[in-house]
Each structure stands twice: as structure tokens, then as C-alpha cells.
Amino acid sequence: NPTLPALLDVLFRDAVNSTLGTHIANLAPANIPRQDLVAAFLTGFPGVNQLKTVTASEMSRLNTGIPAKPASQQSAFGVAGNDLAGFPNGRRPGDDVVDLALRVVMGRLCHPIPVNGTPTDLGLCKPADAPVGTAPFTDGAPLSAADFDSRFPYLKTPNPGATN
């Protein structure tokens, strides 16, 4: 059972229930074992970034058969944001992997995700397993492809610092 969802539950359950006017007993997903996490972080997704010989391991997988998207069409949320060319199918500078990982560990993949514009149930778990799986969890530091240059080293010139 992953620790992060349990910690987020302890830290934010009261605030979530108060804000939403709900009585969710546990924010953490209840699907154990977490096949959604295994697919997202260890094996990849069939047809997207899963290799022919599946070896559960933490590595970057890239399906070069999926064409890259121009920065203006990229979703910072990759595959979960209707962009098969994004994370976890490789890793682009504008992929907001922190927000995406937060959403995945809290059960986003238990709910249908848009694939080529069509809501798709991945069959990894059920929506009832993840009561806040569609919540837009964020670290508060938004990221997008527009934040980067289109050529290496991709980082834009820093903003001038404070005068003091």
C-alpha cells in the first residue's frame, strides 16, 4: 500500500470534506494491490508505452510510433490529459510530472481518461475505489510547454533577480 495517498488523506481529508461539503471517510484509493500504479510507473500501458517483453521496472519508456505534438498542442498532463505523446510515454520538459503523479497516486486512472478525445476506462480499478480521483491535485507550480524554448537547452533566460 503506497504511503503518499495515506499521508495526503491524513493531511487534507478534513479540508476536502469541509470544502466539498462531503463526508469522505478516506481520500486514499482503496484498490489494493494498486494495478493502476504498476501500469503507470512500472510496466507501461498496452498500446502506448508498454514494451513487447514486460519487465516491471522504473524506466523511461517511449513509443516512437506515436507522433510528437507541437508545444501548442501538448497537455501538461500527458496521457491522462488526452496527449498520448506525453508522460508516461517519454518525458517532455513541459510535462507536469509532479501534478500528474499526485493525480495518479490519488486514483485518476480509476476513472475514465480521455484517449484521442474519447473517455476510456483502462480497467485498472473502479471509480468507487478512488473517491477523489478526478480532483485536480497540484503542487501549485503550474508547468506547460510554453515555459520552455523549442531547442536545447530548452530553459528560457531567467528573469532578473531582486535588487536587494
Regions flagged by a language model, labelled:
Residues N1-N164:
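Surface-exposed extracytoplasmic segments
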